[in-house]
C-alpha cells in the first residue's frame, strides 16, 4: 500500500488545515480514503457547469472516478442518469460526496450511514452536520466534513507528480 512521506503529508496537511472540522481523519487516513473511492454518489450534483457541485464531480470523473449524480431536478448530468435520491442509487458506492446545505446535510449523512456497503461520507467544503457525523462515526464510518475533495485530490496528485519527478531525477532521466 502506498503511504505518505513527510513531503506528501505536509502538502495534504496544508489543505486539511482549511477545514473548520477538528474531528476529520488525519492526513494518512484521508490519503487512504481518497485512494479507495472509485464509485462516488454525488448528492446535490449540479447541472450548472459553473458551480462547484458540478466542477468537482467533473474533475473526479476525468480522473477515473465513476461519478453517480444524485439530483431530483435533473434527468442526466455528465451524460449519466441522475438519481432522485441516495436511496435510488442501487449499486454499491465507495463514497457519498455531499453538496447540500449544512441544514439539509444531516439527513443525507444518516441515509449514507444506513447503506450496507458502509461508504465514506464526505461533506464538501463549507458543509457540516456535526450531530449526524458523530452518529455515523459511532457506527464506525469514516466521515469528513468541511473539506474540498478537489483540493485534497489535487494535493495528492501534485505530490504524486513531485515524487515521480524526484524519482526520475534520481535515476538521471
Per-range role (PLM):
Residues 41-43:
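Conserved beta-strand elements of the Class I
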Residues 152-173:
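A charged, well-structured terminal subsegment
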Residues 112-136:
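ADP-ribose/adenylate-binding Rossmann-like module
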Residues 1-17:
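Helix-enriched interaction subdomains in cytosolic or periplasmic regions
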Residues 46, 50, 57-78:
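NAD(P)-binding Rossmann-fold cofactor-contacting core
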Residues 94-95, 120:
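Structural motif
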Residues 20-26, 76-91, 97-107:
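Glycine-rich, highly charged phosphate/nucleotide-binding loops
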Residues 36, 91-92:
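Alpha-helix C-terminal capping/helix-to-coil transition sites in glycosyltransferase folds
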Amino acid at each position: 500500500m502506498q503511504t505518505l512521506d513527510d513531503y506528501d503529508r505536509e502538502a495534504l496537511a496544508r489543505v486539511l488545515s482549511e477545514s473548520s472540522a477538528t474531528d476529520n481523519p488525519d492526513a494518512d487516513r484521508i490519503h487512504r480514503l481518497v485512494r479507495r473511492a472509485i464509485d462516488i454518489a454525488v448528492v446535490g450534483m449540479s447541472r450548472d457547469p459553473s458551480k462547484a457541485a458540478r466542477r468537482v464531480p467533473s474533475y473526479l470523473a476525468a480522473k477515473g472516478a465513476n461519478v453517480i449524480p444524485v439530483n431530483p431536478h435533473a434527468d442526466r448530468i455528465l451524460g449519466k442518469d441522475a438519481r432522485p435520491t441516495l436511496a435510488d442509487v442501487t449499486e454499491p458506492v465507495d463514497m457519498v460526496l455531499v453538496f447540500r446545505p449544512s441544514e439539509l446535510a444531516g439527513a443525507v449523512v444518516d441515509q449514507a450511514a444506513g447503506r450496507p456497503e458502509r461508504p465514506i461520507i464526505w461533506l464538501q467544503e463549507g458543509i457540516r452536520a456535526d450531530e449526524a457525523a458523530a452518529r455515523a462515526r459511532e457506527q464506525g464510518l469514516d466521515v469528513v466534513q468541511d473539506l474540498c475533495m478537489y483540493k485534497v485530490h489535487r494535493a495528492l496528485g501534485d505530490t504524486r507528480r513531485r515524487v515521480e519527478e524526484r524519482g526520475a531525477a534520481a535515476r538521471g532521466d
